[in-house]
Amino acid sequence: MKKAILIALVAVMIAVMGVSFTACNNATTQGQLQNILNDHNHESFEYAVSAQDKDGNPVAGYDGSYTVTLDKYTQGSTVTDFGSATLSDVKKGILVKGHLTVGTTEYFTGSYFSIISGSSYMVPAYSFRTIKKDGNVTFSLNAAYDGKKFNYTRTVDGKESSGTVDLGKVVNYYDNNEFHQALRTITTFSESLAFSFSMPIVSATEASSVSITARVLGKVNVKNAFTDSRADLQDGGIACYKTAISRATEVAGISQTLFYAVGDVAMSGWNMKHILVRIQEPFKADGNTYSMVYDLKTAELH
């Protein structure tokens, strides 16, 4: 029962709130995304997935793993294995991919960002999401942006459909894949950061534009396996911006809290900006309220 509830929870999190959304803002500095790989070529992160009760005690039956990779591509490159598609002759950009495993269910997500304005800013160009249960694909999505139009092809249990989500006149718009990693590069990340944006949502049951709000609630220190592995962070942990993500019309009260490192983290001679140290999301099961927790274990850069 618990595993079935978790699968439903994670599906909602990805499809509605997104284990990842992707971000861009062409009108204000508040949402502009710096080129996160401007001085290196690759980053990867591994998270341990688990559930906790209100006192922080572990809840059995919810363990999993989540990995994220970021890779730089040059102008004219071919990106293979982009969901069910291959991207040919892409603009200079960054591919962000995620892989979440919970029980026998796997979630594959990805976004390709084009680099614009003299190699300074990231703008989402393509996205995909694939869900497998017991090795079988139950949902897939491949999409491309044409301005503020999100053109998609979706397959649900073998039935294919296509459509367009029009974001209209919104100023800030975001994609629903790899959002968490993308937010690391906002140029105005601070304790006073608060803004709203729209994003296209395409799930098995929905295809629409929704409003999302991000707000930094303050600074907190976080300790986990990642901080324990580093001599410079073992004692006090790492200072993080505690950031709340919520949907204007929430589904079953779903929201997320993200913890981004305040300062750069040195790795292999380079600095990683605002790494995502932890994700928390509340859920209810068996009459109790728990939290799904994604805790950073390892990070690599080259």
Regions found by a protein language model. Name each.
Residues A27-D146, F195-H302:
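Acidic, serine/threonine-rich low-complexity disordered tracts
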Residues M1-A8:
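Positively charged n-region of N-terminal signal peptides that target proteins for export
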Residues V19-A23:
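C-terminal motif of bacterial Sec signal peptides marking the signal peptidase cleavage site
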Residues I14-G18:
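Alpha-helical transmembrane segments
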Residues K133-V202:
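A surface/extracellular/periplasmic glyco- and lipid-processing/surface-interacting theme
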